[in-house]
Amino acid sequence: MKRLSLALLLLGTLGTPLFAQSAKVTPLLDKPLTGIPGKEGLMITVTFPPGASDMIHRHNAHAFVYVLEGRIIMQVRGGELVTLGPGQTFYEAPNDIHVVGKNASSTEPAKFLVFFVKDKGAPVLVPAR
């Protein structure tokens, strides 16, 4: 429970400047990965209201994205711009810079699940240029 509280605090402080102000980030799970020394898993949902986007950032983690509702537009630096709908996935490697992340709709919300594999205690989100 202490780890989940820390994750909530971390997401609350880092999420504000990195995600659209009105994006809702909900932590679901924070768990040490005992089979992978020094690593932990973190699972969150992100809900973008209509037209919302996030700032350029990186995760310094493996990030596995699964779209639950709506449509999102994603791109990492040097990668292809993709539009994803429910059931589609997106991957960000630890060294990727996430340059585009936004709701494709100006009228409907979008929601996606993200599972991170990261170093224990490392920040989830880091601003980038």
Annotated model-derived regions:
Residues 33-37, 48-49, 78-95:
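Short acidic-glycine-tyrosine-enriched beta hairpin
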Residues 53-55, 73, 90, 94-103:
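Histidine-centered metal-chelating micro-motifs
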